[in-house]
Structures are given as C-alpha cells and as structure tokens.
A protein has these predicted regions:
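Negatively charged, low-complexity tracts enriched in Asp/Glu with abundant Ser/Thr
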Residues: 1-27
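Generic structural signal for short, solvent-exposed loop/turn connectors between secondary structure elements
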Residues: 1-8, 52-57, 89-91
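Generic alpha-helix detector with strongest preference for long hydrophobic helices that associate
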Residues: 7, 11, 26, 51-55, ...
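A short, structured loop/turn motif at beta-sheet edges
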Residues: 21, 35-38, 65-67
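A short, structured beta-strand/loop element
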Residues: 26-61
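Short, compact, well-ordered microdomains
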Residues: 58-91
Length: 91
C-alpha cells in the first residue's frame, strides 16, 4: 500500500491528478458518497502529500444529483483554485 492508498473514504475515491508547488506535492482524490435521504450524491476533495501526516480534506463541498455531475463540477476548478483549497485547510 502506497502513501496515497490509506485515508478514510479511499474506497469511494477517484484519483484526479497531482498538484505541485515548490517542494510540495499532493495527490488529489475526489470522494463521492450517495446520500439516500436526499436522493443525491455528495463529494469532497482529499489532498494526500508525501507522508500520511499531510492528508487534508475539504468538507462535503459538492451536492449533486449524480456522480457524473460531481465530476463535472470538480472539473470546473483550476489547479490554482485547488492549491488555494489545500493551503486553506488547517493541517
């Protein structure tokens, strides 16, 4: 199991790419989870750095009807916006 394989929600996550800024590198994962009560799908973003201690995650920032809608919304974020997300998360 590699550094990016172990975090809560990994089994529901898709690897979306990698971010780099200076010496920092983050693997970016999008976790989706059905919400049966609402009949919708929630999504949040995980940023996994070079050690397990550098795992950061957003709250549930997406709420859409289908998983493909969450993926589409995620695709609207630029690399700069994703870096702003990870830098704003306490860690």
């Amino acid at each position: 199991m590699g550094m990016s394989d172990a975090f809560p929600g990994r089994e529901r996550s898709r690897h979306m790419g990698e971010l780099k800024r200076g010496p920092n590198r983050w693997d970016v994962y999008l976790e989706v989870q059905p919400d049966a009560e609402l009949g919708a799908v929630r999504g949040r973003i995980h940023f996994v750095g070079t050690t397990e201690a550098t795992h950061r995650a957003t709250g549930w920032v997406f709420l859409e009807w289908q998983e493909r809608d969450v993926l589409e919304r995620f695709g609207e974020f630029s690399a700069v916006e994703l870096l702003q997300f990870v830098e704003a998360i306490p860690g």
